[in-house]
Amino acid sequence: MERAGPGSARPQQQWDQDSVEAWLDDHWDFTFSYFVRKGTREMVNAWFAERVHTIPVCKEGIKGHTESCSCPLQPSPRAESSVPGTPTRKISASEFDRPLRPIVIKDSEGTVSFLSDSDKKEQMPLTSPRFDNDEGDQCSRLLELVKDISSHLDVTALCHKIFLHIHGLISADRYSLFLVCEDSSNDKFLISRLFDVAEGSTLEEASNNCIRLEWNKGIVGHVAAFGEPLNIKDAYEDPRFNAEVDQITGYKTQSILCMPIKNHREEVVGVAQAINKKSGNGGTFTEKDEKDFAAYLAFCGIVLHNAQLYETSLLENKRNQVLLDLASLIFEEQQSLEVILKKIAATIISFMQVQKCTIFIVDEDCSDSFSSVFHMECEELEKSSDTLTRERDANRINYMYAQYVKNTMEPLNIPDVSKDKRFPWTNENMGNINQQCIRSLLCTPIKNGKKNKVIGVCQLVNKMEETTGKVKAFNRNDEQFLEAFVIFCGLGIQNTQMYEAVERAMAKQMVTLEVLSYHASAAEEETRELQSLAAAVVPSAQTLKITDFSFSDFELSDLETALCTIRMFTDLNLVQNFQMKHEVLCKWILSVKKNYRKNVAYHNWRHAFNTAQCMFAALKAGKIQKRLTDLEILALLIAALSHDLDHRGVNNSYIQRSEHPLAQLYCHSIMEHHHFDQCLMILNSPGNQILSGLSIEEYKTTLKIIKQAILATDLALYIKRRGEFFELIMKNQFNLEDPHQKELFLAMLMTACDLSAITKPWPIQQRIAELVATEFFDQGDRERKELNIEPADLMNREKKNKIPSMQVGFIDAICLQLYEALTHVSEDCFPLLDGCRKNRQKWQALAEQQEKTLINGESSQTKRN
């Protein structure tokens, strides 16, 4: 370093710290010699301490990340050694040695079935009751009755016999048995199981007549509603008596003894009625008659309870058979979600007798909406189509109830939608509902195995009466059965989605193999050359001018761009903080460079390098580095270099329209997802693992930021999110301490760096614009040739004269407000805004000149004509 002598007229040179550091970076031999000669033990210890990377005891360092793109880290198997969800053993193997009937049997036609033929069971014949008046034989009659009850489950036959036993005690003229039932609206009523049982009457005669009585109406209805017996001497004097039955049958009712039949929970399950006492006490029933009647009716309660258990078990058997058939159906078809849901909907419609079945699939990426809707009506059951049509008239499907059920995670049963006050309808909406003929509705959430997440909703409309075809309300049984149905429906959906995920993974593998066939890791010779050159000297950032927003790479070789990248990692303290080996860093940089296609005019390695350089300048010269964490800086630089990996020179729209395999992998940001996958592939490749010094948590965090940053370069996402960022800036509410706002800022910063070519000095901007136009015109040519479509003006080679005006429009619509907002965050980023404004003036002048030329040309042509 030269100094001015005492007598020299030349002033002493003033150097700031950055200039000294840059000079030391450029003169590595002197720096090394000075450190060896002047370095103290404290300096050496501090040097080591600066490079020691502390890893938490509970976290395990990553030496080689070989995880797939979709799942970067897998938890240790020992971490989940005890799974809470593991079912406990509830039956031992020895219990299967008991002589139970076969699970699967064949019926008379040889068809395999889960149900046994209950009609073929051998039953002991019912014995006729003995009507001895000897009280000593009453005990034997009771024992005989108990024996019959224990061996038979026919409610009608047993109750008929009980009434014949009762007749021997109380001697009434007629007996009737009414059972409590519920309709589809859960309203109770009474139906006669035995009517007018008399001495000498047969079972067939007593059970043929079926009468329905309303709840809490008449003598029987009153006893059923209040659960208290009635002993009426003269029926016609009681206002509760209904004489319509007498008028129909021509029978004269005098005295009535009516008693409730209760189960073990003291619930009324039936009502027994004795009519017209034959002898004694003036034709009225005595207290002894009441006691005897009540005693025998206790047996009726037992019979009804046992029979209900038996009927319930038969019903459950039949339900289980349907569910087993549904399970078999689900596992037969797992390839197509449309096919499996068509079969499920057809099963539900036919079994539950409903008009319409709609299955809504929740969007995994946006839980507030549905990704797919599958609708089927009973008229479609006879159609032979193998798939459900997704595209339907939106007016045919109502989303409001499904959205409500998805949010509440509880079933919804509406007997009449027009009368339900939870969903206010306007007159216009009511007309729409009437047009759709919606009356009763049952809607149930479809949950995953953990019961804490809704993956879909099943909606049934209009329960139909089998006999009359009229619409009725869904009852509790329908709710329970649909809840069981949707469990299997959820299994089918999840299995099919897993199958589709496997298919997507296979498509991803095909794309990866295609990429790997084109690309390869950096050659060892090239890596050694860069490593040797970097070990000798890497010029300072000032010398390389990579902290300038006006930086241009046109004069640099590819090897020099790699050296600049090493300097960026070094000056951002990433090499030191994360213990990156120079050999690994060199190979990773060259591998990234190699994975950019050379036949792409603009979106190649040079564009990625310029994006990273702008990011470096924003962090350093723009003073943003001190406002971010080391992991965020690391992720941003990696994302900037990798954000267009394996770009094919075409946009997302072309990928979709050409039906490229990449379009099968992602529903949005197709190329950006692919760029991230390529980034992970390189990071996980042997010799390229620059993140191996991170802990597991740091690795996860870094990958998350990298993915968010790369996806942020999709202009469609930028346009969707920028309004929130601009509003925060405008209202002075922007706060980098808020995690969401910080994520939003990093996304905006990535876009600003990606578009930074628009801020370069005019000669550089013109050259880059020519490269962009070349790439766009190549895509337009391919659209004409391969897709037979007329390209947009931006891609149309024949509209080249519109480039200046399109550039002005692009700056106004996309760029200008972004750089204004970025300048509000950091005033040191003003050169980006200033460059953008100056280039807009240049493009505006060219556009006006182009327009004048066009007008003059048209005028000259008119004069000639």
From Swiss-Prot:
Residues binding 3',5'-cyclic GMP: Q807
Cofactors (names): Zn(2+); Mg(2+)
List of catalytic residues: H603 (proton donor)
Keywords from the named record: Allosteric enzyme, cGMP, cGMP-binding, Hydrolase, Magnesium, Metal-binding, Nucleotide-binding, Phosphoprotein, Repeat, Zinc
Catalytic activity, as annotated: 3',5'-cyclic GMP + H2O = GMP + H(+)
Recorded consequence of changing K277A: Decreased cGMP-binding; no change in catalytic activity
All residue ranges annotated as the GAF domain in the record: 154-304, 336-493
Pathway in which the depicted protein is active: Purine metabolism; 3',5'-cyclic GMP degradation; GMP from 3',5'-cyclic GMP: step 1/1
Cofactor: binding comment: Binds 1 Zn(2+) ion per subunit. Binds 2 divalent metal cations per subunit: site 1 preferentially binds zinc, while site 2 has a preference for magnesium. Tightly binds zinc. Binds 1 Mg(2+) ions per subunit. Binds 2 divalent metal cations per subunit: site 1 preferentially binds zinc, while site 2 has a preference for magnesium. Binds magnesium less tightly than zinc.
Regulation of activity: Most potently inhibited by zaprinast and dipyridamole.
PTM sites of type Phosphoserine: S92
PTM statement from Swiss-Prot or TrEMBL: Phosphorylation is regulated by binding of cGMP to the two allosteric sites. Phosphorylation by PRKG1 leads to its activation.
Keyword Metal-binding: yes
Role noted for this protein: Plays a role in signal transduction by regulating the intracellular concentration of cyclic nucleotides. This phosphodiesterase catalyzes the specific hydrolysis of cGMP to 5'-GMP. Specifically regulates nitric-oxide-generated cGMP.
Protein name as catalogued: cGMP-specific 3',5'-cyclic phosphodiesterase
Lineage of the organism: Eukaryota, Metazoa, Chordata, Craniata, Vertebrata
Protein's gene: PDE5A
